[in-house]
């Protein structure tokens, strides 16, 4: 997973590679420059990585973490497969859900923290 952090007028933004946009959207809407929130998530990941699943419910995006994988999903995303979506809506779906390994997510959060503190 590739990512980049930028800062403009004190506001930090994340961009992630295609397929991981929801992770950047989660960061940009739920975390931003809140280093305490990042440290809390990192601590939960590092202590609970092998013990139990972790769920972080946010206002717009939620994060679901198990031993091997992290899923970031928009709270308004309906995962009903009974109703087919029009072709144009799949693009929005791709920006609303993303998966990555826990190690990649830890690296993303550590990099965000380092960027904020620099």
UniProtKB/Swiss-Prot annotation:
Disulfide bond positions: none
NCBIfam families to which the protein is assigned, alphabetical: PRK05248.1-2 (NF003575)
Name of this protein: UPF0231 protein PM0457
Organism annotation: Pasteurella multocida (strain Pm70)
Residues that span the membrane, as ranges: none
Family from the record: Belongs to the UPF0231 family.
Coiled coil: none
Domain of life: Bacteria
Pfam family, one: UPF0231
